[in-house]
Structure formats: structure tokens, C-alpha cells
Amino acid sequence: MTNITKRSLVAAGVLAALMAGNVALAADVPAGVTLAEKQTLVRNNGSEVQSLDPHKIEGVPESNISRDLFEGLLVSDLDGHPAPGVAESWDNKDAKVWTFHLRKDAKWSDGTPVTAQDFVYSWQRSVDPNTASPYASYLQYGHIAGIDEILEGKKPITDLGVKAIDDHTLEVTLSEPVPYFYKLLVHPSTSPVPKAAIEKFGEKWTQPGNIVTNGAYTLKDWVVNERIVLERSPTYWNNAKTVINQVTYLPIASEVTDVNRYRSGEIDMTNNSMPIELFQKLKKEIPDEVHVDPYLCTYYYEINNQKPPFNDVRVRTALKLGMDRDIIVNKVKAQGNMPAYGYTPPYTDGAKLTQPEWFGWSQEKRNEEAKKLLAEAGYTADKPLTINLLYNTSDLHKKLAIAASSLWKKNIGVNVKLVNQEWKTFLDTRHQGTFDVARAGWCADYNEPTSFLNTMLSNSSMNTAHYKSPAFDSIMAETLKVTDEAQRTALYTKAEQQLDKDSAIVPVYYYVNARLVKPWVGGYTGKDPLDNTYTRNMYIVKH
């Protein structure tokens, strides 16, 4: 990415201004705009959620709702920069000891105050083996003191380096200086959770009537596979500047159905992926309602690195080379995506990546090299490699899986069997490692290369490629020992090169965020590359 240093300085300036001025993020209704009498919003969320417990979730659909229900120390502003949430301000000593100063008017939906101890309880719960959080290793990326030993079962959760100095002061001690630590705290897994409700209701604490939240909204209704309805929380500290009273999330997996219900007036915002076959038609017919924006995500095929024959780097490399990204991007997807050559998008803040040699080859040369590698591994036209390709229910993922299977067959003679699973089962299968190759997409939790790279560490709970590389782990450990930004950037490049050398995944393309938004939905900008969209920032214009 060009101009990284300048962008980082600008982001730092925005952050400093937010902290100094204690800016409250909420719906900003321009002068002269007449609001609709009925302030309700209907959004498609793409699938039924895995859970509403911030420590039990790992996907985008769950995070979309969690941002409305729970508020962490920090939130994202409209441009994707970290901004004050429950924490009004924060400071640090040598990027190792961080102190967060909490709002005194932050409350739970039951009216009780949100305190620093709530964050201590939440973070300890997130790393507790009994919680079995898929994001258990997330705080490890921030290198909080004691986290490694806790996750290894060598220390109790009470040894985690987080403590409440008083009700409104939280101190976090890291084992290593991490200058970008504050960026991690926008993620839902770092939100506070209600101890009393969890202890009273157990696994059912997230049900309507039981749940207690501290965000701008609380849960009104949840009909599995039909809808989740949230209503405005009168106890939210900035409720006076919240406009939308109710938001409904629908679990529609089909992009075509999503668009059809949008055009019939049932939905105000579609999910962030539009049907391939309808995209150009929609751009022509309703151009002002089509929003295509940068999105910090990578679409890839995840190879089970531990399962034979995929534990052979020659097989993995052949699959990587045999994927024709130009056809996927230009003929199948055709929505402005960039072909991917690595895991971390090149436009990530703090990244300065170099394209691998193979990316400059023609597809014919890639295919030729892939066939040689397969032959070396024992696979020929008479004895072809056969793989199962797993994808979760979605029109888009199905079309891409069909295209990928066709390309691998045509280009390098690999036979592919397609396997479809619903979202929750799909996630479990990947974690359990009972698959060959799976459709995957990783969207950054914060705008920094480690949000991608850390998920490939051998001990990461998000490493569903089951990739184990001491060399990669060593490079990532080195990033914590340098304070110079240029040196750290060079190490990120080296880490990406190691992933490419090992062909840990098959990168396909870098996402764009493509969705339909009704003209009467105000406050949606699409400028946040993390797509951290908060309902509290939006409003409905009279129409």
C-alpha cells in the first residue's frame, strides 16, 4: 500500500482529537432533514447467528448484532478509526501498561452501572477453558500478561493482566509493548458481559427476557431462522442522540432472495454481498442505492494442512497455482474485486507487501508448474487427486465453489466434490478439522496486518487451516521485539512470504462491500473498511 505513513499519522490525529474532545458518536442528522415518524430499520444479516454471547461468536453475522447490543471500551467511527466507547479516554506507558477511564454514566439495560470490574470479569471469562470461546486467543494477540500460561492451563484466569483500579478505571498490563493494542478493543469479544445474568440463567442468559446489555439496543425478540428484533435501550449513555427505535435482522442466506425482498420493500439494507447475475442490472436500474466500498477481507480456500495428502506442500501449492483468479474476479464475481496473492490485503494499514513470483506468471505457466508438483506427489491423469470442497449455504459461495471445481478440473486435472453445510455446522467442521478444503473468508477485527497474520499462529483458536509452522511463529514473535515501524512492516512482509512458501491457503480475491441501501436510510457511509456498522449512527428520513 502506498502512503502508509501519512495515513497512520492522519489516523493518529483523528484519534487524538476524539480523545481530547470526548466526542460522542451517534446519529448525526443534518439540518433541514425531516425524520420519518416511524424509526425502524430492517437489515438482512446473511444467516442465522451462532450465538448472541460475545464470547461464543466468531462470524460477521454475529458481530453485526453484537455491536448493537454490547459496547466495549472502544468503538469504530464512521471512517473505521477507533473512538471512545465505554472508555472516555485512555493512556499508556511504553505501550505496555494501558489505563482506560470509563464513563460514569455508562449503564446496563437493567439500570446498574457498567464498571471496570465488568471488563475484568468479561475478559477472564473469554479466556476461561470452560467458556470454550472460539476467540479465546484474541487477547493473546494483544499479549496481555499471563495469557499464554492461562490458555495452556498453567495459570488461573485471575492471573490475567487486567485489573479494576476503581469502578471507572481499568488497567491492562501487557507482557510485550504493543503500540496498536487499543485497536483490538473495538472487537465484540472484548465487550463487557453481565455477570449476574450469566450466573442466574447459565446458557440461556442471551434469551429475550434474560439478557442484559450495555449497548444502544437490547433484545426484544428472537425467532430462530426467522428474525432477531432489537429495541432502543433507554439506559444507554448516549440514548438521547440515538434515533432508530427498532432494528430487525433477517437470516436470509440467498443473495437473490435478499435483493427480491429489498425491491419489494421488506428490507432497508441488504447483506454485504450482491447476486453475481443481478449486479450490473441493479447498478443500471437503481445506481444510487448500490453501495460498493473497500472491505478489509480476503476470500480464500482453506486447506486442511494436517490431513493427508494436503500435508504435502506440493499438493497445496498445486491447488494455489491452479486457481484462475482472473476468471473468478472478472467473469464470475464481476463486482470490482482484486485478485488475491496473499492473506493480508495490501491496503491494510501497516502493510507493504510484495507480490510473489508466481503471481506474475501466466495462468498457463501456473498450470504447468502445478501439474509437475502433482506428478511429483503421485497424482497423474490416470490417478487424479480428488478433494471435497466444503462451503456454507449461500448463492454466492455455491457459484464460486462450482467455478473453483471447474477451474481445478480444467487447469490441473483435480476432481472436486462439493459439500454444503449450514453456517453453524460449517464453523464446527472447520474447527474440528474434518474437511479437505473449505470456503473461507477473513475480515479484519482491526486495521493492522496482525489481525490477519495472528490467526495463522500455531496456537491460535482461529487457525482452522490447522497450519503449524515454527518458522512463521518465529517471525511473528520477532514483530513484538521491534519498535521501528519500518522493521515491523518488513517482518509482516516476511510472514506473508512464509505463508506463501508453505501454500497454507489458496487466496482468491480481496473483498469489496457491495450492498443495497434504501435512499431514506441516513447515516450509512460505507467508509469504514471494517464494515463496523452501528444502528445508533443511522436514522430514517421521511419518505
Swiss-Prot record:
The GO terms describing molecular function are: oligopeptide binding; peptide transmembrane transporter activity
Q: Which cysteine pairs are joined by S-S bonds?
A: C297-C443
Task: Give the Gene3D superfamilies listed for this entry.
Answer: Dipeptide-binding Protein, Domain 1, Dipeptide-binding Protein, Domain 3, Periplasmic binding protein-like II
Keyword Cytoplasm present in the record's keywords: the answer is: no
Residues of the signal peptide:
1-26
Record's Pfam families?
Answer: SBP_bac_5
Its GO biological process annotations read:
chaperone-mediated protein folding; oligopeptide import across plasma membrane; oligopeptide transport; peptide transport; protein transport; response to heat
Q: Does the keyword Phosphoprotein apply?
A: no
Q: Which GO terms describe its cellular component?
A: ATP-binding cassette (ABC) transporter complex, substrate-binding subunit-containing; membrane; outer membrane-bounded periplasmic space
Instruction: Cite the entry's keywords alphabetically.
Output: Disulfide bond, Peptide transport, Periplasm, Protein transport, Signal, Transport
Subcellular location, in the record's words? Answer: Periplasm
Q: Which PANTHER family does its entry note?
A: PERIPLASMIC BINDING COMPONENT OF ABC TRANSPORTER, PERIPLASMIC OLIGOPEPTIDE-BINDING PROTEIN-RELATED
**Subunit architecture:** The complex is composed of two ATP-binding proteins (OppD and OppF), two transmembrane proteins (OppB and OppC) and a solute-binding protein (OppA).
What job does the chain carry out? Part of the ABC transporter complex OppABCDF involved in the uptake of oligopeptides. Plays an important nutritional role. Binds peptides containing from two to five amino acid residues. Displays a preference for tripeptides and tetrapeptides over dipeptides and pentapeptides, for peptides composed of L-amino acids and for positively charged peptides. Cannot bind the cell wall peptide L-Ala-D-Gly-gamma-meso-diaminopimelic acid.
Family recorded in the similarity comment: Belongs to the bacterial solute-binding protein 5 family.
Protein known as: Periplasmic oligopeptide-binding protein OppA
Q: Which organism is it from?
A: Escherichia coli (strain K12)
| Gene name tied to this protein | oppA
